Amino acid sequence: MAALAPLPPLPAQFKSIQHHLRTAQEHDKRDPVVAYYCRLYAMQTGMKIDSKTPECRKFLSKLMDQLEALKKQLGDNEAVTQEIVGCAHLENYALKMFLYADNEDRAGRFHKNMIKSFYTASLLIDVITVFGELTDENVKHRKYARWKATYIHNCLKNGETPQAGPVGIEEENDVEENEDVGATSLPTQPPQPSSSSAYDPSNLAPGSYSGIQIPPGAHAPANTPAEVPHSTGVTSNAVQPSPQTVPAAPAVDPDLYTASQGDIRLTPEDFARAQKYCKYAGSALQYEDVGTAVQNLQKALRLLTTGRE
């Protein structure tokens, strides 16, 4: 992909989107579709924050130029031209990153790469809002990922051992970005998610994350590659994990076959949702994620045969 024209300095008003823009830069070569939507999210959010002051107008204008250049380079890529495909692509990518970090966490393997994966997953779920309202599941994943990144980062910084696993996932408090995260001392017991402790990569030493790559599939759940496949033309020397046995597909609910098609009336919205689930399934199969593909196909089948989800 051709290099994009650089952006001017980020106005202070746009501080809340700086990490989304950084994520875009990190994915320019790794996954241009993800990079495109990260910039689109930053553009839309920036417009809502301030589109009138000269420095903000100039920044947004240059960001728009980047978006137009990216869209031209991506051409007829369905993930950009079709929102359903684009949403599925982003959701699957964010989920792979979340599952990689969650698997490392549950196994007690705490490191900077895992912290960044948690935090980046939360940023990508922010980006999914360009397609509309988030699902309840995505909202929970975002809150949990951002809090886990905060908690583990603070523990490691303070020389403490984090508690593995889903601690405090049921808490209602939202996690917001806080520049003072590094100054917060932790109690003996793991804290619950709160607005006073949020992970901010900028608080780490310069270069802490430079060049970090998630090992493809390393320590990730079966059929859940940590790094979404992409074609770069560069051969990786990383050791690949041994082939994993594909788990048996979940049994399909017999009720789906007994529903009478003639007894239900589907709306255009029902057909659109069914199509969305099929697109999600197709995207999951690109990553050999059988479980997610089957789950989405079952959702589509249930909707089409019962008229409900």
Swiss-Prot record:
- Expressing tissues: Widely expressed. Expressed in brain, liver, kidney, spleen, lung and heart (at protein level).
Could you mention a single GO BP entry for this protein?
late endosome to vacuole transport via multivesicular body sorting pathway
Give the UniProt subcellular location, in the record's own words: Cytoplasm; Endosome membrane
Q: Where is this region: Interaction with CHMP5?
A: 2-75
The record's InterPro entries line, in alphabetical order, gives: Vta1-like, Vta1/CALS_N, Vta1/CALS_N_sf, Vta1_C
Give start-end positions of Polar residues composition bias: 232-245
UniProt keyword list: Acetylation, Cytoplasm, Endosome, Membrane, Protein transport, Transport
What Pfam families does its record include?
A: Vta1, Vta1_C
Keyword Acetylation among UniProt keywords: yes
Which residue positions does N-acetylalanine occur at?
Answer: 2
Topology in membrane: Peripheral membrane protein
Region (Interaction with IST1) residue ranges read 2-186
Note down the stretches annotated as region Interaction with VPS4B: 198-309
What GO terms fall under cellular component here? cytoplasm; cytosol; endosome membrane; nucleoplasm
What ranges does the record give for the region Disordered, renumbered to this chain? 173-254
- Please, which domain of life does this record's source organism belong to? Eukaryota
- What is the annotated role of this protein in its UniProt record? Involved in the endosomal multivesicular bodies (MVB) pathway. MVBs contain intraluminal vesicles (ILVs) that are generated by invagination and scission from the limiting membrane of the endosome and mostly are delivered to lysosomes enabling degradation of membrane proteins, such as stimulated growth factor receptors, lysosomal enzymes and lipids. Thought to be a cofactor of VPS4A/B, which catalyzes disassembles membrane-associated ESCRT-III assemblies. Involved in the sorting and down-regulation of EGFR.
Q: How does it assemble?
A: Interacts with VPS4B. Interacts with CHMP1B. Interacts with CHMP2A; the interaction probably involves the open conformation of (polymerized) CHMP2A. Interacts with CHMP3. Interacts with CHMP5; the interaction involves soluble CHMP5. Interacts with IST1.
Q: Which family does it belong to?
A: Belongs to the VTA1 family.
Name by which UniProt lists this protein? Vacuolar protein sorting-associated protein VTA1 homolog
Organism of this sequence: Mus musculus
Q: Which gene encodes it?
A: Vta1
